From Swiss-Prot:
<protein>
    <recommendedName>
        <fullName>Putative hydrogenase maturation protease MJ0253</fullName>
        <ecNumber>3.4.23.-</ecNumber>
    </recommendedName>
</protein>
<keyword id="KW-0378">Hydrolase</keyword>
<dbReference type="GO" id="GO:0008047">
    <property type="term" value="F:enzyme activator activity"/>
</dbReference>
<comment type="similarity">
    <text>Belongs to the peptidase A31 family.</text>
</comment>
<dbReference type="Pfam" id="PF01750">
    <property type="entry name" value="HycI"/>
</dbReference>
<dbReference type="GO" id="GO:0036211">
    <property type="term" value="P:protein modification process"/>
</dbReference>
<dbReference type="GO" id="GO:0004190">
    <property type="term" value="F:aspartic-type endopeptidase activity"/>
</dbReference>
<dbReference type="InterPro" id="IPR004411">
    <property type="entry name" value="Pept_A31_F420-red_hyd_d"/>
</dbReference>
<dbReference type="GO" id="GO:0016485">
    <property type="term" value="P:protein processing"/>
</dbReference>
<dbReference type="InterPro" id="IPR000671">
    <property type="entry name" value="Peptidase_A31"/>
</dbReference>
<dbReference type="InterPro" id="IPR023430">
    <property type="entry name" value="Pept_HybD-like_dom_sf"/>
</dbReference>
<keyword id="KW-0064">Aspartyl protease</keyword>
<keyword id="KW-0645">Protease</keyword>
<dbReference type="GO" id="GO:0004175">
    <property type="term" value="F:endopeptidase activity"/>
</dbReference>
Length: 154
């Protein structure tokens, strides 16, 4: 069995509108015939917790898929460089929110290739529960998958 050296992590919460983008993308990826060296994880709203437990010496590349708010047109896909991630000076651990950016930067500094595929959301409904993606973001799921498949081949 080939070792898993590419990890695709979908982040978000399906209950809060477009925040569920990453979960929708990995749900589709899980049904695809991907190379044996690729592992797909739906990390939900706990992306950092999952990454901290899953990253080992075999991982060469991590692709994180998540909804973003960069003031773009809703449904716009943006490949985000590690240097563009928010500059949070320290980790802030609590029961619900662990910033992912510092952890991804640390992984990058350790030689792991980090790719973030973000989709500009339209409706982030938290704390109000509203399952389902907006039309614009739902249309962007396949485009994100296309980009991810390209990243796997690199």
């Amino acid at each position: 069995m080939k070792k898993k050296d590419i990890l695709i992590v979908g982040c978000g919460n399906l209950l809060f509108g477009d925040d569920g983008f990453g979960c929708e993308v990995v749900s589709k990826l899980e049904k695809m015939n991907l190379p044996d060296n690729v592992e797909v994880i739906d990390a939900g709203a706990s992306g950092a917790y999952y990454l901290m437990t899953l990253v080992d010496e075999d991982i060469k590349k991590i692709i994180v898929v998540d909804a973003i708010d960069f003031d773009l047109e809703p449904g716009t896909i943006k490949k985000i460089d590690v240097d563009e991630l928010p500059n949070i000076k320290k980790y802030s651990f609590d029961a619900h929110n662990v910033p992912l950016a510092p952890f991804l930067k640390d992984l990058h500094n350790k030689g792991i290739e980090v790719v973030v595929i973000g989709c500009q959301g339209k409706e982030f409904t938290m704390p109000d529960i509203k399952p389902g993606l907006s039309e614009e973001v739902a249309k962007a799921v396949d485009k994100a998958i296309e980009i991810i498949l390209g990243e796997i081949k690199k």
